[in-house]
From Swiss-Prot:
Record's protein name: NAD kinase
Organism the protein comes from: Sodalis glossinidius (strain morsitans)
HAMAP family: NAD_kinase
Cofactor(s) this protein cannot do without: a divalent metal cation
Gene Ontology, cellular component aspect: cytoplasm
Keyword NAD: yes
Disulfide bonds: none
Pfam name, any one: NAD_kinase_C
Molecular function terms, GO-annotated: ATP binding; metal ion binding; NAD binding; NAD+ kinase activity
Functional note: Involved in the regulation of the intracellular balance of NAD and NADP, and is a key enzyme in the biosynthesis of NADP. Catalyzes specifically the phosphorylation on 2'-hydroxyl of the adenosine moiety of NAD to yield NADP.
Keywords: ATP-binding, Cytoplasm, Kinase, NAD, NADP, Nucleotide-binding, Transferase
EC class (word): transferase
UniProt keyword Transferase present: yes
Binding site for NAD(+): D73, G74, N147, E148, H158, R175, D177, T188, A189, Y190, S191, L192, S193, Q247
């Protein structure tokens, strides 16, 4: 066996039989080709693969050269926040809805993976955001996101008053239902639904997108990817939260501030050589086809 990769992890949280079938097919296919395969514990239990070598996401990150995530973008986001801490490449097979991040078609995935495993792929380093809750000089609760960090009410939608500082310089104050702070990866997710700009994946920038601002002059703002964003609350509205990729929530207490910056970690996302980001946008967003 001649391959760029030797140890491969299979990742996902299957929700329907087709996804489970893809996990099982991939497991046997990789084994037949002589790869050392590590499967997430939960998947092996679902499939009753008692002979499989299993591990956690951290185990896969430490031991594997490549992680194959099967599922939708939500599965990829959950796995990527952990796998980004390790020296591992990640690719996705789409068994969800949109599939911006899990872009391999399950019907042709094995053929595409054959090329990828032979070293024919392109790599994209996608940066993460890091959000931390601080009180004065004491910082505590911390999380990361691939797509976005969102300031929002915890229970009932209502107006929030806050100030935004960029690199310790006051930028603007706002009355709105919240604020979306998105990476280029996340610019085609929640941020796009709120009217934010599309940023191509390797742009070194962060988008700040207001949610239902109480002024007609409030518009999305794109800033340098190396900037630090501070959210300050003059009078805290009860039940505020920061959510990361809509999967992890950090509650905000009175007197606390939020700091959001680019993480030190990057997701090493790979695609087949024929991957075209703009074709993906066109097919996922229903853009018009070429005229000539």
């Amino acid at each position: 066996m001649t391959s760029t990769f030797q140890t491969i992890g299979i990742v996902g949280h299957p929700r329907h039989p087709n996804a489970l079938a893809t996990h099982e097919t991939l497991y046997h296919w990789l084994n037949e080709k002589g790869y050392h395969v590590i499967m997430e514990h939960q998947i092996a239990r679902y499939l009753a693969l008692h002979e499989a070598i299993t591990g956690s996401l951290a185990d896969i990150g430490q031991q594997a050269d490549l992680a194959i995530v099967i599922g939708g973008d939500g599965n990829m986001l959950g796995a990527a926040r952990i796998l980004a801490r390790y020296d591992i490449k990640v690719i996705g097979i789409n068994r969800g809805n949109l599939g911006f991040l899990t872009d391999l078609d399950p019907d042709s995935a094995l053929a595409q993976l054959s090329d990828v495993l032979a070293g024919h792929f392109r790599s994209e380093k996608r940066f993460l955001l890091e959000a931390q809750v601080c009180r004065g000089d004491v910082c505590g609760r911390l999380s990361s996101s691939i797509n976005e960090v969102v300031l929002h009410p915890g229970k009932v939608a209502h107006m929030i008053e806050f100030e935004v500082y960029i690199d310790d310089t006051f930028a603007f104050s706002q009355r709105s239902d919240g604020l979306i702070i998105a990476t280029p990866t996340g610019s085609t997710a929640y941020s796009l639904s709120a009217g934010g700009p599309i940023l191509t994946p390797l742009v070194d920038a962060i988008a700040l997108v207001p949610m239902f601002p109480h002024t007609l002059s409030s518009r999305p703002l794109v800033i340098n990817g190396g900037s630090t964003i501070r959210l300050k609350f003059s009078q805290l509205t009860p039940d505020l939260e920061i959510s990361c990729d809509s999967q992890i929530a950090l509650p905000i207490q009175d007197g606390e501030e939020i700091f959001i910056r680019r993480s030190d970690y990057y997701l090493d996302l790979i695609h087949p050589n024929d991957y075209n980001y703009f074709n993906t946008l066109s097919s996922k967003l229903g853009w018009s086809k070429k005229l000539f």
